[in-house]
Amino acid sequence: MVKKTKSNSLKKVATLALANLLLVGALTDNSAKAESKKDDTDLKLVSHNVYMLSTVLYPNWGQYKRADLIGQSSYIKNNDVVIFNEAFDNGASDKLLSNVKKEYPYQTPVLGRSQSGWDKTEGSYSSTVAEDGGVAIVSKYPIKEKIQHVFKSGCGFDNDSNKGFVYTKIEKNGKNVHVIGTHTQSEDSRCGAGHDRKIRAEQMKEISDFVKKKNIPKDETVYIGGDLNVNKGTPEFKDMLKNLNVNDVLYAGHNSTWDPQSNSIAKYNYPNGKPEHLDYIFTDKDHKQPKQLVNEVVTEKPKPWDVYAFPYYYVYNDFSDHYPIKAYSK
């Protein structure tokens, strides 16, 4: 039997004290990690060109039905912010925004539809053009500022619309993060050879100039996303990164966002078309960077659905002619 001594008692007290210190340290470290996570302003975003053209002109694309299908989809859930493009049809886009309102209660109006609901309207807004800009942003977190900016110029169909970009300042965990959603000049035979590319470059510089003039603090992140109508891997892609002043990202999922080979709606329009990667979410170079940003193309499909437009029934199994992309930090 070992006799208890003063020395042994002191050692026991010292051991207990050390254990308590280690426990306090571990709790403090875990608390700091939790606080760091709490203050994190990295966002989980989605951008989707939902192909909601006017139902009067294009009655065979099931815009209202797809508004419901998108609202029920898996990809639309559990994000922080969603950017919609081509939400042109008033009724169908209103239904879509209503369908996602429970999860994303903070929403902008659709770009260029009116001047109501915005903190500011900039650029070449017109109340007489045939079409609005089709872009809307919805958020899980409060939107503290909403600005719509209509591009100075466009060509072809885009020249008779209010296409531009939507700026939002979003508050997450008491800190600001900024999201810009856009849909730049589309390829259009009425534009003339190469003119659409020239206009896209000008529009991207408008976005970059807006960010610079906004004087956003450098320690806040600025996301820029949407259907940019630039195919990844082309010479124009490098120009896009420069004109937007953004960093490239990691890519995952399907290798294109518009793919007539695998997408039933795109295939109907362009049965011999080649796949293109046109949709992106980037971050402005001059502001806080998230952890490595990933753009993942999601090819989720609904069950086959049909729509009747005299004298035919049409059957598809996609949400849109574009696939959505998810952006998240790795």
UniProtKB/Swiss-Prot annotation:
One of its GO terms (molecular function) is toxin activity. Bacterial hemolysins are exotoxins that attack blood cell membranes and cause cell rupture. Beta-hemolysin is a phospholipase C with specific activity toward sphingomyelins. Has a high specificity for sphingomyelin, hydrolyzes lysophosphatidylcholine at a much lower rate, but has no activity towards phosphatidylcholine, phosphatidylethanolamine, or phosphatidylserine. It comes from the Bacteria. It comes from Staphylococcus aureus. NCBIfam families: sphingomy. This is Phospholipase C. Residues 1-34 form the signal peptide. SUPFAM superfamilies: DNase I-like. Keywords: Cytolysis, Disulfide bond, Hemolysis, Hydrolase, Signal, Toxin, Virulence. It catalyses: a 1,2-diacyl-sn-glycero-3-phosphocholine + H2O = phosphocholine + a 1,2-diacyl-sn-glycerol + H(+). GO terms for cellular component: extracellular region. Belongs to the neutral sphingomyelinase family. Disulfide bonds join C155-C191. GO terms for biological process: killing of cells of another organism. Gene3D superfamilies: Endonuclease/exonuclease/phosphatase. InterPro entries: Endo/exonu/phosph_ase_sf, Endo/exonuclease/phosphatase, Sph/SMPD2-like, Sphingomyelinase/PLipase_C. Monomer. The gene is hlb. Its EC number is 3.1.4.3.
